[in-house]
Amino acid sequence: MTRILGIDPGSQRTGVGVIDVDEYGCSRHVYHAPLVLLGQSSFAGRLKQLLLGLSAVIEEYSPKEVAIEKVFMSKNADSALKLGQARGVAISAVVLRDLPVHEYAARQIKLAVVGRGGADKQQIQHMVGVMLNLQGRLQSDAADALAVAITHAHVSATAQRLGVSTKQAWSRK
């Protein structure tokens, strides 16, 4: 059984999701939540809150691997920089515990979970709920984090069957 932590980074809210994947590639939901970072008066305070929150999740759930969504380019440079900083803090929380980090673009995640790279938030929320047998509507940041973890589970299973790295399993040569 492999435990995977998925992270959907954000400067105001970061989604986290934990799944277990058995030797047959079947995923089971363990935990999900948004880490809400708006209670701090400064951006540095939010980054600290993110580091502490992710550290607590890693400590409690002991993932063996971590998957994180790659940053996308925003029209707003300030937003893109803040997102990049939040992502850097998230990666730091992971590598400080010597865990492997796997990165996936939003389009890759949508393709892996919904089957269409242009899927919208509601489609992702629905498919994550179906795949993990969850009842009710998922909060979007947490659903995105679970989608990242599911994507990594699928890519890892494919890579293992092919005897290649996860990067090679995803590339289209």
UniProtKB/Swiss-Prot annotation:
Q: Which cofactor does it need?
A: Mg(2+)
Principal subcellular localization: cytoplasm
Taxonomy, superkingdom: Bacteria
Q: What is its EC number?
A: 3.1.21.10
Chain residues that bind Mg(2+) 2 = E69
GO biological process, alphabetically ordered: DNA recombination; DNA repair
Q: Which reaction does it catalyse?
A: Endonucleolytic cleavage at a junction such as a reciprocal single-stranded crossover between two homologous DNA duplexes (Holliday junction)
Specify one Pfam family: RuvC
Task: Quote the function comment for this protein.
Answer: The RuvA-RuvB-RuvC complex processes Holliday junction (HJ) DNA during genetic recombination and DNA repair. Endonuclease that resolves HJ intermediates. Cleaves cruciform DNA by making single-stranded nicks across the HJ at symmetrical positions within the homologous arms, yielding a 5'-phosphate and a 3'-hydroxyl group; requires a central core of homology in the junction. The consensus cleavage sequence is 5'-(A/T)TT(C/G)-3'. Cleavage occurs on the 3'-side of the TT dinucleotide at the point of strand exchange.
Task: Please give the family membership noted in the entry.
Answer: Belongs to the RuvC family.
What protein name does the entry list? Crossover junction endodeoxyribonuclease RuvC
The scientific name of the source species is: Xylella fastidiosa (strain 9a5c)
Species lineage: Bacteria, Pseudomonadati, Pseudomonadota, Gammaproteobacteria, Lysobacterales
Q: Which gene encodes it?
A: ruvC
